[in-house]
From Swiss-Prot:
It comes from Arabidopsis thaliana. CDD domains: DHDPS. The keyword Transit peptide applies. The gene is DHDPS2. This is 4-hydroxy-tetrahydrodipicolinate synthase 2, chloroplastic. GO terms for cellular component: chloroplast. The lineage of its organism: Eukaryota, Viridiplantae, Streptophyta, Embryophyta, Tracheophyta. The record marks T107, Y170 as: Part of a proton relay during catalysis. The active site is at Y194 (proton donor/acceptor), K222 (schiff-base intermediate with substrate). Pathway: Amino-acid biosynthesis; L-lysine biosynthesis via DAP pathway; (S)-tetrahydrodipicolinate from L-aspartate: step 3/4. Its main location: plastid. It holds the Pfam family DHDPS.
Amino acid sequence: MAALKGYGLCSMDSALQFPCPKLFNSYKRRSSKWVSPKAAVVPNFHLPMRSLEVKNRTNTDDIKALRVITAIKTPYLPDGRFDLEAYDDLVNIQIQNGAEGVIVGGTTGEGQLMSWDEHIMLIGHTVNCFGGSIKVIGNTGSNSTREAIHATEQGFAVGMHAALHINPYYGKTSIEGLIAHFQSVLHMGPTIIYNVPGRTGQDIPPRAIFKLSQNPNLAGVKECVGNKRVEEYTENGVVVWSGNDDECHDSRWDYGATGVISVTSNLVPGLMRKLMFEGRNSSLNSKLLPLMAWLFHEPNPIGINTALAQLGVSRPVFRLPYVPLPLSKRLEFVKLVKEIGREHFVGEKDVQALDDDDFILIGRY
């Protein structure tokens, strides 16, 4: 993601005056790790408030209580910019159908394809429009600790209720490094740690989570390893959300998960709420499993992007490298919608297969 521009804070002519750090004093060692005076972070003056201020204070227990959190999709205009009208409609539908939180700019929301300016803007927009009705959890994680610190400060500055943090990927670190990375951001506010080894290439082991759980700001873990891991956490008092839609029913009712952070709820939020709130429902779960399998036939968010376009909820615009599912899979989705019932899905238009030529692929935006 694009680096954020820094500014000299010690200029006498600056409109915002900050004290110059005493460099020699700040280098005193109280332990084996040196901590900079401001965590090497400076405010971005184009943001609505300084990144060191906090707009909302949310109790971590409020985050721990959430059962249905939607990893919200980010729709696009034909030129690749955010389609905020479609985005607002989608978030409104989530609220109306009982979703309690949204992950903004996560994997499903394609935060990995956003600049940090886009990312923080979308978090702030979501807070300003919907923050009184739904918990806004900003994905401000990064494989760079410096970027994670900076983005998380900005996310809390524009009002997000909690942060989602992934472990450093590609340039993997040691378990001790994982712990130090998360400790660098945990003090800022309520935090969900996201464990998805299939994407990061590294599992976050329970011993790391148990160490981090000593911090009261750890709301819990979005866990994608499986239900045995879910059970291990719940038996040890760690809140956990299933990160696998196809396992979330059993995670909730058999293994003690608090709920789910879901992709499928973009499409059927009311049914996902029913699955998490109304007790064991094997019949409904079985009904939804084929849809969940379809959504993850290719890596997320390819399936959800294709489905929302077919439902007419978002434009058929893809930021590369994502491309739509082929026609054969789109025809399968039409059949799935009819089997489950169009009334359970978001939007009001008839589901369509769409032609290949209907899709717009954007590489420069």
